Amino acid sequence: MFTPEQFTKVMSQLGNFSQLGQMFQPGNVAMLQALQANGASSTPSLFPAMPSVIPSLAAPSSPTTSNLTADQIVKTCEQLETDGDVDGLFRFMCTIPPQKTQEVAGNEAFLRARALVCFHASHFRELYAILENNKFSPKYHPKLQEMWHEAHYREQEKNRGKSLCAVDKYRVRKKYPMPRTIWDGEQKTHCFKERTRSLLREWYLKDPYPNPPKKKELANATGLTQMQVGNWFKNRRQRDRAAAAKNKQNIIGVELKKTSSDMSDSDDDFEDSMTDSPSPIDEPKDLSKSHIPKLSPTLLPKMATPFDMFAAAANPLMMLNLNPALYMQFHNFFNTMRNPQIDEEENSETTVEVEADIEPPKKRSKLSIDEILNIKSEVSPSQCSPCSNESLSPKRAVKTEEVKKEDDEAAEEDSRSVKSETSEDPKHSSPKSTTSQSE
């Protein structure tokens, strides 16, 4: 069973519910009193009888509310708001008659009291409507702005099921900006207003390292503390140093890119000049690319990509790919070292060819078998017999004599060649056998 004091405390805690304000309207109070009387007379209830504190607070004929004027109601709301008594403010607003409520509905103090009660009752939609549709004095803006932001924070925490960090709160403030009814429209950047930041920038341009008296003077001018002023100057100097270093890196990168492009252009011009005109060292025999001698792949290995500086340091020949001028000097030097060997080989080949051309034809020492057969075919057997020599005509006799002379000369040559061969090789047969075979 609840005592009257406990029930009063519970009712004060239940003031956060939205239905509670409607329950304390004059018509509802009469209904509650009737229900209380019927419940007490008929059947026992789990809860005790309604204490007499409700009629005393909510009855429209109560001397505390019905006899008050509009100014008295406004002053009472202001006093309760200043004291921070939200429960007392809620109970007082519930006892105001509807006629009096309409009279003070547009008053700023009454609107602030309603906004405060809605904020603590978690009626955030009603709170937003009050703050957006009514204009308030600038001296109350900070408190109302805090309620605006805190209401949005609580809504987001309820939706997400977790508390918000500083970054989350910053995003909520950006997503739900304050209405102009509680805000002068001036942006706050880095927790300082734009007017304050402009004044700090002016002092920073004059002296980036202010002494303590200047910090104190600047703090009084901006409404900040000396520590805030010192931190702002420190952070600004650090940002300027970082920006200067970044700009320096960008300038160096642009210069390097420009020099590399100039070098690439000069390299292209140099390569074009080397391909278009012959060098003074090379002989101007043929300017086509097919006659340009190429270096062997073992002397200049292919460079892997990406280029490895340690591999280039280990193999100096790979550095030639980085310097076209050095590459051409090495190329010309290699050609000068290679040209004498090529000239010697060409000279040796030409001497061999000349000797082959100048060599005289060898003298024939023997008649071929075909020639001998042709000679024999021209002489008939009757002409060769000794008995027929007288019957031959003079022309035939002359021909036979010429043939005999040729045969004798051939036989002599054969005998000479056989003798020379037998002198060199004793195994050969005698000259007589050779002559007989040739005959």
Swiss-Prot record:
GO terms for cellular component: nucleus; transcription regulator complex. Expressed in the posterior gonad. Expressed in some cells in the head that are probably neurons. Expressed in the dorsal and ventral neuron RMD pair and the inner labial neuron class IL1. Not expressed in BAG neurons. It comes from the Eukaryota. The keyword Transcription applies. Residues 398-428 have a biased composition (Basic and acidic residues). Keywords: Developmental protein, DNA-binding, Homeobox, Nucleus, Transcription, Transcription regulation. One of its GO terms (biological process) is regulation of transcription by RNA polymerase II. It is found in: Nucleus. Pfam families: Homeodomain (PF00046), SIX1_SD (PF16878). InterPro entries: HD, Homeodomain-like_sf, SIX1_SD. The keyword Transcription applies. One of its GO terms (molecular function) is DNA-binding transcription factor activity, RNA polymerase II-specific. Gene3D superfamilies: Homeodomain-like. Disruption phenotype: RNAi-mediated knockdown in hermaphrodite adults causes embryonic and larval lethality and head morphogenesis defects in L1 and L2 larval stages of offspring. PROSITE patterns: HOMEOBOX_2. Its main location: nucleus. Residues 379-392 have a biased composition (Polar residues). Residues 264-274, 344-358 have a biased composition (Acidic residues). Interacts with gmn-1. Transcription factor which binds a motif with the core sequence 5'-GTATCA-3'. Plays a role in head morphogenesis. Involved in embryonic development. Required for cell specification of the RIA interneurons. May cooperate with the transcription factor vab-3 and phosphatase eya-1 to repress transcription factor ets-5 expression in non BAG neuronal cells. PANTHER family: HOMEOBOX PROTEIN SIX, PROTEIN OPTIX. This is Homeobox protein ceh-32. It comes from Caenorhabditis elegans.
